[in-house]
Regions:
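Acidic, contiguous N-terminal accessory segments
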Residues: 1-144
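Feature activates predominantly on carbohydrate-active enzymes
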Residues: 11, 88-293
Length: 293
């Protein structure tokens, strides 16, 4: 069933709250009432499979029947068209809902992903089906890095929990996960060269000793987050907050042995994921007072 043009406000549908609020929003009169959607992606849209999956998730959360085609339009549905615009930089996008069709233009995967999260907030559901207001949105992030830090060094969180949390915060355009993997209570990442680091014997008994992430789990998390436009920044904290490291390897942070071990394990971590997927590794550097804790 096709979209129905609505030229006046519809009482049963609430006005959408957009979080974070876009850079520029021009609201028209009325909007479009519809019962299904069809999505068309231009051939040059980047990471099409990821965007198709995200589109299905957006409409699926409302129970909206959606068909997706990479090449052809279908009759009888409100059409969403995604097209690449090289003139739109970074994670910016332009989203338009008009009577004839709805469109998204962006110059990158991040721009398209952000637009879909705004689209997610534009949809209303009522007795008459689904509704989107007539609107023109031009948006770009105020901050290039919009992050969340999880202190799993002190408080272990399961991979499933982290993935679900990232799924939720991605809807608000968070694009960075800072993963604090090590601290005094525990070392949470598998290091094949130094297996003692994840041994429960060297972890605090009160902080889920022996719980850690395998290298495969880190790879899976990086890939999963990439599909949500989130970059993972793993952190190995040093020289402060290094009790678990010092106990497991029986070293002081000022020892040459400790330095060599840190270099080796950082190299091992860097080899796990291609640089383009995980370009940054955080090494803490807090409390560098020249003293051993």
């Amino acid at each position: 069933m096709g979209g129905e043009v609505v030229t006046a406000p519809v009482p049963e549908f609430s006005s959408p709250a957009l979080i974070p609020y876009p850079s520029k929003v021009v609201r028209g009169k009325g909007g479009v009432r519809f019962k299904s959607v069809h999505v068309h992606l231009d051939r040059d849209v980047p990471r099409r499979d990821d965007l198709v999956r995200e589109m299905k998730d957006v409409f699926g959360m409302f129970g909206i029947p959606a068909s997706v085609s990479k090449d052809v339009f279908e009759e009888g549905s409100l059409t969403w068209e995604l097209s690449l615009d090289a003139g739109i930089e970074g994670e910016a996008y332009i989203l338009s809902v008009a009577p004839e069709k709805a469109t998204v233009r962006a110059g990158s995967f991040g721009g398209f992903f952000n637009a879909l999260q705004t689209l997610r907030q534009l949809v209303s559901k009522g007795k008459g089906g689904f509704f989107m207001p007539s609107v023109q949105i031009s948006d770009e992030p105020a901050f290039a890095l919009r992050g969340m830090m999880l202190d799993v060094g002190r408080y272990y969180m399961s991979p499933a929990f982290i993935k679900e949390l990232m799924r939720r915060v991605s809807r608000y355009k968070i694009n960075t996960l800072h993963l604090h993997l090590t601290d005094d209570p525990a070392w949470r990442l598998e290091v094949k060269k130094f297996p003692a680091l994840t041994d429960r014997v060297f972890h605090w008994k009160s902080r889920l000793p022996g719980k850690f992430y395998t290298q495969e789990q880190l790879k899976e998390l990086v890939d999963y987050c990439a599909g949500l436009n989130i970059q993972v920044i793993p952190e190995i904290d040093m020289p402060g907050h290094s009790q678990a490291f010092r106990k497991a390897l029986n070293v002081k942070m000022s020892d040459e042995k400790a330095t060599k071990a840190l270099v080796a394990l950082i190299k091992e971590m860097c080899s796990l994921v291609p640089k383009e997927k995980m370009p940054i590794i955080h090494i803490g550097t807090d409390e560098a007072h020249g003293k051993d804790e």
